[in-house]
């Protein structure tokens, strides 16, 4: 359900925080310390797998949460849909696919920016490439990511493995983000920022920021 009387980014953050609370509030602190994880694979435990099933259902998938595919993109799509984005967001089961569609310029209010030059703002998506089982070699920089996204749009390349989190809180030198399938849960992570509010944390390979002014 969509919320009313608030900016879209506020609605999005409200949904992300609600889901994080539903999972019991697991966290990764800025020093890497983990808190609030009740099981190494929370996603496989009841009722958590049923929540994952809700995320899949939001993008029209028949997966019920007891399946193997990574569900972090489904989580992002669920949050946008619940916040009332409707057709203003490209709902897909893979981050690189929906980011490629955003990068096409066809989704007003959403744009892909260079993390080296762009301060984070509330409701932005912090995008990182990653490796993993059955993953092709991912881009290692914003420029490389832009090239790969163009190839995906032109159907000259397959999707690649990556991850997005929603920026939910900003402090001097720190950002809190919430994402799905982070250590097998919906997790709130604190990352380091520089003095200008740009991401400067070596725990992930950040290749883009989806600016969100919906």
Language model features with spans:
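A residue-level signal for beta-strand positions that form part of recognition/binding surfaces
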Residues: 9, 13, 174, 206
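Surface-exposed intrinsically disordered loops and tails
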Residues: 32-61, 104-111, 135-156, 195-201
């Amino acid at each position: 359900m969509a919320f009313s009387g608030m900016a879209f980014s506020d609605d999005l953050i409200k949904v992300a925080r609600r889901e994080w609370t539903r999972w019991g509030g697991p966290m990764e602190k800025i020093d890497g310390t983990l808190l609030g994880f009740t099981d190494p694979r929370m996603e496989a435990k009841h009722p958590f797998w049923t929540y994952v099933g809700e995320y899949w259902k939001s993008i029209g998938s028949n997966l019920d949460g007891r399946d193997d595919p990574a569900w972090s993109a489904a989580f992002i799509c669920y949050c946008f849909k619940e916040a009332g984005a409707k057709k203003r967001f490209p709902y897909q089961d893979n981050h690189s696919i929906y980011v490629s569609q955003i990068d096409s310029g066809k989704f007003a209010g959403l744009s892909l920016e260079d993390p080296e030059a762009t301060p984070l703002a509330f409701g932005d998506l912090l995008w990182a490439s990653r490796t993993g089982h059955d993953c092709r070699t991912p881009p290692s920089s914003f420029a490389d990511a832009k090239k790969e996204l163009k190839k995906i749009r032109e159907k000259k390349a397959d999707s690649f493995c990556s991850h997005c989190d929603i920026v939910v809180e900003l402090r001097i030198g720190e950002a809190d983000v919430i994402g799905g399938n982070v250590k097998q849960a919906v997790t709130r992570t604190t990352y380091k920022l520089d003095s200008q509010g740009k991401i400067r944390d070596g725990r992930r390979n950040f290749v883009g920021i989806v600016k969100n002014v919906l």
